[in-house]
Structure formats: structure tokens, C-alpha cells
């Protein structure tokens, strides 16, 4: 989940992981088609259907390996471009890019009502600054709605890893700090419901070569009830 520049690096990175779903934030609408390794792309409602969209608008976009994934409309006039909700027969995912401290209460209600298996993206929230409004979203989803922070879960269960700038994969250690943003903060999160079983989670720092965020890669499955 990250903002990026189209120069071939992103396509090579996506080919390496072959993820079932990729959520990208701040994708300039005019450049989205240059992501060539995924053919099923889902943009926020209103934007996918408009041909003459302003080329400067940045979108949160879902790239899906197959066309079983469908878009679910989200209704928020000012911030439709920042959210994308997708689902198939087994999963539901909510990708977001929260504005910093702006209209958080109304946005929180939309996120809560989504009731998705996974909520992920750039929350613009960091534990060191838990007094800002954006942290309220994470706090509510974890403490009131029963979601778990998969990175913290991975650290506790020894399932968290990071890939350094040389491409070496190493186990992440609980108590250490791992940034997800060039500004030396951890502002990107993957939150999941209790029935999501984490296999592993990775912060890949190599993406800082072509974006200002580290990618977060999650391997998980849904427990059978």
C-alpha cells in the first residue's frame, strides 16, 4: 500500500509478489493504466465510470488477480477518491487513505459500517502522536470493533518480517521500530477481524527507491467456522 512513480519499478515489484489483491494509494488517474501486470483494476465509485476525469486526481485503487472481485460503492462526497471497497464470495477488503485530522468522525462511521474482513492503507496515524484524531479510527476499530493490527500480531507471534534495502529478508523483533513512511513514522496499517489467521506479514523497504512508503505484504487465510 503506497504512493508510487511509474517507471517500471512498480510493475517489477508486483510481478515478484504475485499478490491476489494490491491496494495502492495516491494513484494519479492518468497513470493507473500503466500498471500492466494486473488487468482487473477497481477504482472508487464515480471515478471508474467517468472517462474525462481530471488527470490530477489521486485515487485509492485495488488491483485484483482475477475478476471475481467486485466493487462496493461508498458514499462520501468529499472523499470518494480515497476509499475503495471490494469483495468476492469469501472476502471483503476496504482500502483507504485518510486525510490528516479532517472530518474524521464522519469518515469513521463509513469505515465502521463497511464491516470488512480487512481494512488497510495509509491512516496518517502514528502511535507517537496518538492525540491526533486519526488515531481515533485505529483505536475504535481495535478496541470497539474487535479488529487486530496484523503487524503487531505478527510481532507477537513471530510472523513479522522486513526486507531491507539490499533485499535481505529478516525477522522483525518485538520492541523495535519499523517505519512504513519516508518521514520515519509508521502510518500504514492492516487491520483484520478475529477470524483472519495470519501466516506472515512483511514490510518491504525496497519500495522507498520509487515511492515514499514501504509496501506491506500480508499472507493470511480465513478460519473455517
Predicted regions: what is each one?
Residues 21-91, 95-99:
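Structured beta-strand-rich core segments of catalytic domains in phosphoester-bond hydrolases
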Residues 21, 103-193:
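Metal-dependent phosphoesterases centered on the DNase I-like endonuclease/exonuclease/phosphatase
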Residues 8-16, 84-87, 103-117:
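Short, basic/hydrophobic alpha-helical segments
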Residues 205-225:
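Surface polyanion/phosphate-binding segment centered on an Asp-His-Pro turn
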Residues 2-6, 29-33, 101-103, 125-131, ...:
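Active-site environment of divalent metal-dependent phosphoester hydrolases
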Residues 21-24, 54-71, 88, 92, ...:
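Conserved beta strand-loop-helix elements of the APE1-like EEP
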Residues 1, 27, 96-98, 122-123, ...:
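Active-site metal-binding loops of divalent metal-dependent hydrolases
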Residues 1-35, 222-225:
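N-terminal, active-site-proximal structural segment of metallo-dependent hydrolase catalytic domains
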Amino acid at each position: 500500500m503506497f504512493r508510487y512513480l511509474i517507471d517500471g519499478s512498480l510493475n517489477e515489484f508486483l510481478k515478484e509478489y504475485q499478490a491476489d489483491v494490491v491496494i495502492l494509494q495516491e494513484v494519479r488517474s492518468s497513470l493507473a493504466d500503466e500498471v500492466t501486470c494486473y488487468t482487473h483494476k477497481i477504482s472508487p465509485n464515480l471515478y471508474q465510470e467517468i472517462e474525462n476525469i481530471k488527470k490530477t486526481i489521486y485515487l485509492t485503487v485495488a488491483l485484483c488477480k482475477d475478476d471475481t472481485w467486485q466493487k462496493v460503492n461508498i458514499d462520501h462526497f468529499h472523499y470518494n477518491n480515497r476509499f475503495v471497497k471490494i469483495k468476492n464470495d469469501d472476502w471483503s477488503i476496504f482500502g483507504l487513505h485518510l486525510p490528516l485530522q479532517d472530518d474524521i468522525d464522519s469518515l469513521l462511521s463509513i469505515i465502521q459500517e463497511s464491516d470488512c474482513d480487512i481494512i488497510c492503507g495509509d491512516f496518517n496515524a502514528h502511535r507517537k502522536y496518538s492525540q491526533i484524531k486519526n488515531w481515533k479510527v485505529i483505536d475504535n476499530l481495535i478496541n470497539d470493533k474487535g479488529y487486530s493490527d496484523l503487524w503487531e500480531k505478527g510481532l507477537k507471534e513471530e510472523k513479522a518480517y522486513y526486507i531491507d534495502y539490499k533485499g535481505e529478508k529478516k525477522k522483525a523483533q518485538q520492541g523495535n521500530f519499523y517505519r512504513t513512511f519516508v518521514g520515519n513514522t509508521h502510518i500504514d496499517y492492516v487491520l483484520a477481524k478475529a477470524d483472519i489467521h495470519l501466516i506472515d506479514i512483511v514490510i518491504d523497504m525496497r519500495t522507498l527507491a520509487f515511492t515514499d512508503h514501504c509496501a506491506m505484504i500480508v499472507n493470511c487465510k480465513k478460519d473455517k467456522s
